[in-house]
């Protein structure tokens, strides 16, 4: 299955140890989602529609009220990239 470039970037960040944190309204609906790198930096190219796409693909999952992390299916979807650290 092919995924978009934006989805690929987010999955790569999550595979390196990043996380997605959400903000819920009083009615328990998701209002906003933010993607953080493993170093704690906020990734600017992430929005609610991208979050919903990744959740629909079952590439991310949250358990026990913790931030969203990449799943094994998400790891299979992400292609290897050279990390220039």
Swiss-Prot record:
* Pfam families reported in the protein's UniProt record: YjhX_toxin
Spell out the InterPro entries in the cross-references. Answer: YjhX_toxin
Similarity comment: family membership: Belongs to the UPF0386 family.
What is this protein's record name?
UPF0386 protein Arad_1912
Native source species: Rhizobium rhizogenes (strain K84 / ATCC BAA-868) (Agrobacterium radiobacter)
């Amino acid at each position: 299955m092919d995924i978009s470039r934006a989805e690929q970037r987010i999955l790569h960040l999550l595979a390196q140890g990043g996380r997605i944190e959400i903000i819920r309204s009083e009615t328990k609906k998701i209002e906003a989602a933010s993607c953080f790198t493993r170093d704690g930096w906020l990734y600017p190219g992430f929005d609610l529609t991208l979050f919903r796409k990744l959740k629909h693909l079952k590439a991310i999952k949250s358990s026990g009220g913790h931030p969203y992390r990449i799943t094994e299916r998400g790891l299979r979807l992400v292609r290897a990239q050279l990390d220039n650290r």
